[in-house]
Amino acid sequence: MLFRSVMSVKYSEDHAWVKVQDEDLVTIGITDFAQEQLGDLVYIELPKVGHECSRGDNISVIESVKSASDLVAPVSGEIVEVNDRLEDDPELVSEDLMDEVWFIKVKLSNPSELDELMNEETYQTFIGD
């Protein structure tokens, strides 16, 4: 088994960040890049706690004044917590993406999927920054 540092952050091609909390628990949100592309958010629909998601599933709807988008699951597992504050105040996403404003927490069913995500440097290259 490969060692993954607790609290490391990975990124998906769909512009989700994945913060590793421990060996089988991650917190997921959207990147600054995604939020900037969407603009002012007006609505977020979160999945239900207990929902099983597979990598690549659309798990959340994000609507902005510009467009609607889906949060695509970057990993597979059971959703164990959702950030209900986002449904009441979607504009929170633009304030502080990584520390306070997360979408869901997932108990991983396949931790090796984390190895397929990008590190910070690779993600910055991916978005052309």
Where are these regions (language model features)?
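Short, flexible surface segments
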Residues: D14, D22, K48-V49, R55, ...
